[in-house]
Amino acid sequence: MTESKRILADVLLRPVITEKATALMEQRKYVFEVMPTATKPLIRAAVEEMFGVRVTAVNTLKLPRKQRRVGRSVGYRSRPKRAIVTLAEGDSITLFPDT
């Protein structure tokens, strides 16, 4: 595996499987949790390389940080970044293979 493909493989952390994300799949939109430093062109290249599909749009969002307590001290969890990837007409990604 070349260095550029290894970098692209590290961009996508995991697919997001929620009720809302599952409903978006019917509109050819897939939600992934990505590295906080990932840019839209990098996310587009990673999805196209890993899944062999054409991406028409990438929307990103950062979730709000959540407060966590340990004893008396208060800390915060980091803000995860998500990407909503829209695929071209006729393309799809199989997240749940039939077994």
Curated annotation (Swiss-Prot):
Picking any one GO molecular function of the record gives: rRNA binding
A Gene Ontology biological process term: translation
- PROSITE patterns under this entry? RIBOSOMAL_L23
Keyword tags: Ribonucleoprotein, Ribosomal protein, RNA-binding, rRNA-binding
Q: Which domain of life is it from?
A: Bacteria
Q: Which InterPro entries match?
A: Nucleotide-bd_a/b_plait_sf (IPR012677), Ribosomal_uL23-like (IPR013025), Ribosomal_uL23/eL15/eS24_sf (IPR012678), Ribosomal_uL23_CS (IPR001014)
Q: Which family is this protein grouped under? A: Belongs to the universal ribosomal protein uL23 family.
Q: What is known about what this protein does?
A: One of the early assembly proteins it binds 23S rRNA. One of the proteins that surrounds the polypeptide exit tunnel on the outside of the ribosome. Forms the main docking site for trigger factor binding to the ribosome.
Q: What is this protein called?
A: Large ribosomal subunit protein uL23
